[in-house]
UniProtKB/Swiss-Prot annotation:
This is Malonyl-[acyl-carrier protein] O-methyltransferase 2. The keyword Methyltransferase applies. GO terms for molecular function: carboxyl-O-methyltransferase activity; malonyl-CoA methyltransferase activity. Pathway: Cofactor biosynthesis; biotin biosynthesis. The lineage of its organism: Bacteria, Pseudomonadati, Pseudomonadota, Gammaproteobacteria, Legionellales. Its EC number is 2.1.1.197. InterPro entries: BioC, Malonyl-ACP_OMT, Methyltransf_25, SAM-dependent_MTases_sf. Keywords: Biotin biosynthesis, Methyltransferase, S-adenosyl-L-methionine, Transferase. The keyword S-adenosyl-L-methionine applies. NCBIfam families: BioC (TIGR02072).
Length: 248
């Protein structure tokens, strides 16, 4: 799989976190539940499902427990995370694929549901990613995803956090690609820590410490949070989107 140097840095950050991710992913689990809740209330086809950026399989297991399916694919481009996912779902019939969601993993018009929990912030070209996913969905297929929005990690210095989009800018991208928007919501989640160092360790423990456009060739610095903060909170401003492929 050919990836550029930036993708390699993202891979490296997540592969390093393969054995710590699950212990520090309480926020990610809750976000996944919140994304699934309205989706389960909709009457959608779930025969063939793809869980992109599946990580250690937390989201894949939640999807498998929520919907009847014929084929469920778990896709990630970090090999060590996929190994963890396979271990978590070894009793299931889930198929695992080592691939990047920014490539065309599946044939056109082949998927009923695409699910992605907290993965698309790592897309280098989100609009092109949406075009690719649109083509892989069947007519009236559904795309459901959560993604950090502007305001996430606001406690970090500007040079120590990645740029995030607004809810409205993502809505505009989806509509420009051709999706019909079913829901677009945003919620705030917070995680508290005893010290700034513990907060930074939590980010590194889930592999989210790779800066997409660093001023220096490194990830988070040891103290990106103001030193006068003794009781530290990290904010997750999350967008939840469900969209349908409409053929004109």
């Amino acid at each position: 799989m050919m990836v550029n140097s930036l993708k390699k840095r993202i891979q490296r950050s997540f592969n390093k976190a393969f054995d710590t991710y699950d212990d520090h992913a309480s926020i990610q689990r809750e976000i996944c539940k919140q994304l699934l809740k309205p989706l389960k209330e909709m009457r959608i086809q779930t025969k063939i499902i793809a869980d992109f950026a599946c990580g250690t399989g937390i989201s894949t297991k939640a999807v498998a427990d929520s919907f009847p399916y014929q084929n469920l694919y778990a896709i990630d481009f970090c090999e060590k995370l996929l190994i963890q996912a396979k271990s978590k779902l070894k009793e299931s019939n889930v198929e695992f694929i080592l691939a990047d969601f920014e490539t065309n993993v599946f044939l056109c018009n082949s998927l009923d549901l695409i699910f992605c929990n907290m993965g698309f912030q790592w897309a280098l070209d989100l609009k092109q990613t949406f075009f690719s996913l649109f083509s892989q969905l069947k007519a009236f297929g559904v795309l459901a995803f959560s993604v950090p929005l502007l305001g996430t990690f606001c406690e970090l210095r500007n040079d120590c956090r990645n740029p995030f989009l607004t809810l409205q800018s993502i809505v505009q991208l989806l509509k420009a690609v051709g999706f019909e928007l079913l829901t677009a919501d945003e919620k705030i989640f917070t995680d508290s820590f005893e010290s700034p160092l513990d907060a930074i360790r939590s980010i590194k423990s889930i592999g989210a410490n790779c800066l997409l456009y660093p001023k220096r060739n490194k990830g988070l610095s040891p103290m990106p949070i103001e030193k006068n903060n003794t009781d530290t909170t990290l904010t997750y401003h999350i967008g939840f989107f469900i969209a349908k492929k409409i053929i004109q």
